[in-house]
C-alpha cells in the first residue's frame, strides 16, 4: 500500500545535522519503500540547501548530492519561496530537481499526506 510522507526541514545545510539526517531518512524511505510518495519541503534556513555548487571538505556529506539522489529515486524537493527570497535566493538556478513552492502547497501536503516529519 502506497504511503505518502512529507519531510519538512528547517535548518541550514551545514552547521547542524538536521538537513543531513532529514535527507538521509528520505533517501532510505524511498529505497525501502519504492511504492511510496515522498516530498521534502525546505523552509527557513533550509531553503539554502537548494543552492547548487556548495563546496564541502573531502569526506564530508554533500547536501546537493543527497538531494539529487532523492530526486533520482522519485522524491520531490519543494523550496519555500518566501523563505528563499528572504535569504537572497532569487533569480538563481536551484539544485536540479528542486522547485519553488508556497505555504498553500505545504498546507495541502500536510493535510493530505499520511505522515509528516520535521527536522
Give the location of each predicted region.
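Extreme N-terminal starter segment of soluble prokaryotic enzymes
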Residues: 2-6
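C-terminal structural segments of small proteins and small subunits
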Residues: 86-119
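Short, glycine-rich nucleotide/cofactor-binding loops
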Residues: 7-22, 50-55
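Short internal beta-strands
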Residues: 26, 38-44, 77-81
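Small/aliphatic-rich secondary-structure junction motif
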Residues: 32-50
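A glycine-rich helix N-cap at a beta->alpha junction
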Residues: 56-83
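Short glycine-enriched, charge-decorated loop/helix-capping segments at active-site entrances
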Residues: 53-58, 94-96
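Histidine-anchored nucleotide/phosphate-binding helix
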Residues: 19-32, 40
Amino acid at each position: 500500500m502506497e504511503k505518502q510522507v512529507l519531510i519538512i526541514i528547517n535548518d541550514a545545510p551545514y552547521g547542524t545535522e538536521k538537513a543531513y539526517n532529514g535527507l538521509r531518512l528520505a533517501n532510505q524511505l524511498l529505497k525501502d519503500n519504492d511504492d511510496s510518495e515522498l516530498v521534502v519541503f525546505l523552509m527557513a534556513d533550509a531553503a539554502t540547501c537548494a543552492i547548487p555548487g556548495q563546496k564541502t571538505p573531502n569526506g564530508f556529506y554533500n547536501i546537493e548530492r543527497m538531494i539529487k539522489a532523492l530526486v533520482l529515486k522519485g522524491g520531490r524537493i519543494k523550496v519555500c519561496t518566501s523563505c528563499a527570497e528572504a535569504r537572497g535566493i532569487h533569480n538563481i538556478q536551484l539544485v536540479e530537481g528542486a522547485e519553488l513552492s508556497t505555504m498553500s502547497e505545504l498546507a495541502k501536503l500536510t493535510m493530505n499526506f499520511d505522515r509528516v516529519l520535521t527536522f
